[in-house]
């Protein structure tokens, strides 16, 4: 479950007294998400989401995340907008946790995205990058390339335990990533979402209606954000009983890239780097999943995601030599 910190009625009432939102009419925990405690809140003024940031979140990063969403909202980009308290501050404290109230975003997250939704998502991602072009905040990518080798050291046996031969496959991927790092460092950079999976995007029908969960946002290559989306939107299960059997849906990937380029055309260097960026983003999620898979105790409330899903992506990307391989 996603609610790690329980909020009493008395604590909620005292917290809301610091806002001009009226009294609570409805308040319930939200099951989605694994990083923070999230609640649906309805007051006489409207619908909101209340988030309590758990200890795994670096409190020093919270002003950056809040400022980012305020910036996007000021540009008219659809995302949850932080609500200011009577003291003019968005970040407050509830149940000994940093907490923030944001506006409610209409829409649903797609379970099986369509090609039209992928195109609309690509457009939305590019519009986000343009809207953030003049955002002054800066945050290093804590899960970027400089962290991957450290995350991998000592994990070879864990990889072999879930799939024989996987250690050698990962090492081969590292060789290719390392060869491309110097080139990738010169790509256009800016503020990226870095985690725009289907459960972090909302749609009204086939149309993208907004993005949520910016708590991995950072400063990095813009095309890396596109690579994250290709990994999370354009692969489908080839075998429902075998997580290692995934297939790249060329139509969805092509639609996503086309949607992005209709708003922000990729530079030649970004197109050339796309295979390496896709491989790198797959490595990032493989390593975090492998770590969770190996360290989460049996019977834990939060079930870790299978790293083999991203091992399959690594194997796919190693075979791709150009952006055309993704439908660009």
Curated annotation (Swiss-Prot):
CDD domains in the cross-refs: HomoserineK_II
Metabolic or biological pathway: Amino-acid biosynthesis; L-threonine biosynthesis; L-threonine from L-aspartate: step 4/5
GO MF annotations, alphabetized: ATP binding; homoserine kinase activity
PANTHER family per UniProt: AMINOGLYCOSIDE PHOSPHOTRANSFERASE DOMAIN-CONTAINING PROTEIN, AMINOGLYCOSIDE PHOSPHOTRANSFERASE DOMAIN-CONTAINING PROTEIN-RELATED
GO terms for biological process, alphabetical: threonine biosynthetic process
NCBIfam families: PRK05231.1 (NF003558), thrB_alt (TIGR00938)
Keyword check for Methyltransferase: no
Protein's UniProt name: Homoserine kinase
One Pfam short name: APH
UniProt keyword terms in alphabetical order: Amino-acid biosynthesis, ATP-binding, Kinase, Nucleotide-binding, Threonine biosynthesis, Transferase
Family per similarity comment: Belongs to the pseudomonas-type ThrB family.
The protein's Enzyme Commission number: 2.7.1.39
Catalytic reaction annotation: L-homoserine + ATP = O-phospho-L-homoserine + ADP + H(+)
Keyword GTP-binding on entry: no
Top class in the EC scheme: transferase
């Amino acid at each position: 479950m996603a609610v790690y910190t329980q909020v009493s009625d008395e604590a909620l009432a005292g917290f809301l007294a610091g806002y001009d939102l009226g009294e609570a009419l409805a308040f319930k925990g939200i099951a989605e998400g694994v990083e923070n405690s999230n609640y649906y809140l309805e007051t006489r003024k409207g619908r909101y989401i209340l988030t309590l940031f758990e200890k795994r979140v670096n409190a020093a990063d919270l002003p950056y995340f809040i400022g980012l969403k305020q910036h996007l909202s000021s540009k008219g980009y659809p995302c949850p907008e932080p609500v200011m308290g009577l003291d003019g501050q968005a970040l407050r404290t509830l149940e000994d946790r940093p907490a923030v109230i944001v506006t409610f975003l209409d829409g649903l997250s797609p379970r099986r995205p369509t090609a039209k939704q992928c195109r609309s998502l690509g457009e939305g991602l590019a519009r986000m990058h343009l809207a953030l072009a003049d955002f002054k905040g800066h945050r290093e990518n804590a899960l970027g390339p400089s962290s991957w080798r450290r995350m991998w050291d000592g994990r070879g046996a864990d990889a072999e335990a879930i799939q024989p031969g996987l250690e050698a496959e990962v090492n081969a991927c590292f060789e290719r990533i390392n060869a491309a790092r110097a080139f990738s460092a010169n790509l256009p950079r800016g503020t990226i979402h870095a985690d725009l999976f289907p459960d972090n995007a909302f749609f009204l029908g086939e149309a993208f209606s907004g993005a949520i969960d910016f708590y991995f946002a950072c400063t990095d290559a813009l095309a890396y954000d596109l690579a994250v989306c290709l990994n999370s939107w354009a692969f489908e299960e080839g075998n429902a009983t075998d997580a290692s059997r995934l297939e790249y849906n060329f139509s969805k990937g092509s639609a996503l890239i086309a949607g992005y380029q209709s708003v922000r055309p990729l530079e030649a260097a970004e197109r050339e780097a796309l295979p390496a960026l896709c491989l790198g983003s797959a490595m990032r999620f493989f390593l975090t999943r492998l770590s969770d898979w190996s360290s989460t105790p049996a019977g834990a409330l939060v079930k870790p995601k299978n790293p083999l899903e991203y091992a399959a992506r690594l194997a796919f990307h190693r075979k791709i030599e150009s952006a055309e391989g993704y439908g660009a």
